[in-house]
Amino acid sequence: MTKNLLVELGLEEIPAYIVTPAMHQLRDRMATFLTDNRLAFDSIDVFSTPRRLAVRVRGLADQQTDLTEDFKGPAKKIALDADGNFTKAAEGFVRGKGLTTADIEFREIKGEEYVYVTKHEAGQPAKTVLAGIPEVLKAMTFPVSMNWASNKFAYIRPVHTLTVLLDDEALDMDFLDITSGRISRGHRFLGNETEIASADSYEADLRAQFVITDPAERQNMIVEQIKAIEDKHNVTVEIDEDLLNEVLNLVEYPTAFMGSFDTKYLEVPEEVLVTSMKNHQRYFVVRDKAGKLLPNFISVRNGNDQYLDNVIKGNEKVLVARLEDGEFFWREDQKLKIADLVERLKVVTFHEKIGSLYEHMERTKVIAEKLADLAGLSAGEKADVARAADIYKFDLLTGMVGEFDELQGIMGEKYALLAGEKPAVAAAIREHYLPNSAEGELPESKVGAVLALADKFDTLLSFFSVGLIPSGSNDPYALRRATQGIVRILEAFGWEIPLDQLIAELYSLNFASLTYDNQPAVMDFIRARVEKMMDKTIPKDIREAVLASSTFVVRLQLAASSAIFQKAKEADYKEAVENLSRVFNLAEKAEVTAIDEALFENDQEKALAAAVAGLELTEDMAGNLDKLFALSPVIAAFFDNTMVMVDDATVKANRLALLKALADKASAVAVFNLLNSK
């Protein structure tokens, strides 16, 4: 016979970003607890609001399954003394299992007898096991926790209720400073405390108290209400998924409504208005059918539609205060001169160990000019890169960015255009922040891409130089994101810039403000980001072989990893890799590089030398791999008919040099002896 179990934890309001992860954590911990304790169940439903986390376990067994375990102990010769009595070793072993020496039997394993005991444990009633639920709740972890009252324990928020029901039976247990029961709390303003009749009536009992416990249902309510507003007013609402997920975790009973603001604020840049509404007020943006921003917004109330007019007015008043700030900064910032703001960056700290933002910009300009050459930019584009690098951080000292830091770069572009800067320069100021996430938008212009690369390179090299290197999951300066941005930009623009050569050249620079250091660590860090870009289905040996190649060009390494992965599916892969691996293994022993054809002793040696001399690899990695695999029979014939490690030192050195010549060429694709040919 099975039952349904409900566990609800009632708390003060949880931060919206924690609600969903905490709900899933509770589900996972409950599933682990039940499984570890041999309580079978069918499924687990999850519920959450800002003031509660809950799970309902369906089809929970009424008793643990029985457990029978065999335990191996010491060898018989250790378990028995000379008189055949059990030793202390045997007695201690069985005592540790809760058994006696009467339970011992001997079993032979590979010719020697060992002590064995069998322990039978009858399953306990479910209610006995469920007394451990408080420990499940205590084990929950959160990004932030707090203490309250005079309690010594900490939790995400103060706990008010714990509801534990097995079907319709309330189970008593203590958690922190409360005792469980069947009481739950309704909506903070519209509902009351209520008794949950049974695990199955949970949603209905709280719905009567204006609480929608299912987050998916709340989300559907919000979306449907917004669509109704769209239809009524003939508008389009931007339903941003991240904002929607946040809003549904701010309310227990959602009611969407539309508010408005004065059209005069539409003179402020759209990005300012959208940031004010979306990021600061959690409002949805409203546009007309053509996509033009309207002086309206959609918000979601935590409650029903009573007194909604007052709620709308209150939300409008709060938004207007934000828009007033935006309008003021927009007006005042235009009075500032870019040159003056750049000069002031000399006293703005980039990092106390690295120097000022102005010094960061100076280094970035030098790097940008080198990158512009390597990327083949035109003279006009190079001039735009240089100008953008001179000023690109100026907007950090504007009032608008000081108030709305999300707009850095965006406002820089707008103010630069107003000041008469070229559109390409202004766009680069905005684009240098891109990408701002793992899958974020990339720069569109070459000028912006070069500036973005240069800024990220200096950031990476500077922090590594002063020992501020990410470790584990700790990356306070977002260096992984910056490096991922470097890799993505290089791949997207197809710039075949050898990163090892570039980094070496950058490390040769001597800046007055900072000397770069720690080159090997930087290279390994970049390689790790390139590996992240490779297809996740590509085996580790292929990734490592390609990353060790002599071609540290992002696009080519990504292409090589894909080409080898596809080649691995072909019948001749194993043999070809084995032959090339043998070449690489022996090539490591080479001490000279000159090849003397007069020392060749057989046709197979001459054939391999001719093949190596004629081998020309290009940027087509799949084609290169075909050429190398086509050499497999030639390599095999060479090894079948030629002893490399002969006594004659001159001949041996010549043959090793030949193999090294082939390995050097092939290493542009991969280091083949790192591949698994099994």
From Swiss-Prot:
<dbReference type="GO" id="GO:0004820">
    <property type="term" value="F:glycine-tRNA ligase activity"/>
</dbReference>
<dbReference type="GO" id="GO:0006426">
    <property type="term" value="P:glycyl-tRNA aminoacylation"/>
</dbReference>
<dbReference type="InterPro" id="IPR006194">
    <property type="entry name" value="Gly-tRNA-synth_heterodimer"/>
</dbReference>
<comment type="subunit">
    <text>Tetramer of two alpha and two beta subunits.</text>
</comment>
<dbReference type="Pfam" id="PF02092">
    <property type="entry name" value="tRNA_synt_2f"/>
</dbReference>
<keyword id="KW-0648">Protein biosynthesis</keyword>
<dbReference type="InterPro" id="IPR015944">
    <property type="entry name" value="Gly-tRNA-synth_bsu"/>
</dbReference>
<dbReference type="InterPro" id="IPR008909">
    <property type="entry name" value="DALR_anticod-bd"/>
</dbReference>
<dbReference type="GO" id="GO:0006420">
    <property type="term" value="P:arginyl-tRNA aminoacylation"/>
</dbReference>
<comment type="similarity">
    <text>Belongs to the class-II aminoacyl-tRNA synthetase family.</text>
</comment>
<keyword id="KW-0547">Nucleotide-binding</keyword>
<dbReference type="GO" id="GO:0005829">
    <property type="term" value="C:cytosol"/>
</dbReference>
<dbReference type="GO" id="GO:0004814">
    <property type="term" value="F:arginine-tRNA ligase activity"/>
</dbReference>
<keyword id="KW-0963">Cytoplasm</keyword>
<dbReference type="Pfam" id="PF05746">
    <property type="entry name" value="DALR_1"/>
</dbReference>
<dbReference type="GO" id="GO:0005524">
    <property type="term" value="F:ATP binding"/>
</dbReference>
<protein>
    <recommendedName>
        <fullName>Glycine--tRNA ligase beta subunit</fullName>
        <ecNumber>6.1.1.14</ecNumber>
    </recommendedName>
</protein>
<keyword id="KW-0436">Ligase</keyword>
<keyword id="KW-0067">ATP-binding</keyword>
<keyword id="KW-0030">Aminoacyl-tRNA synthetase</keyword>
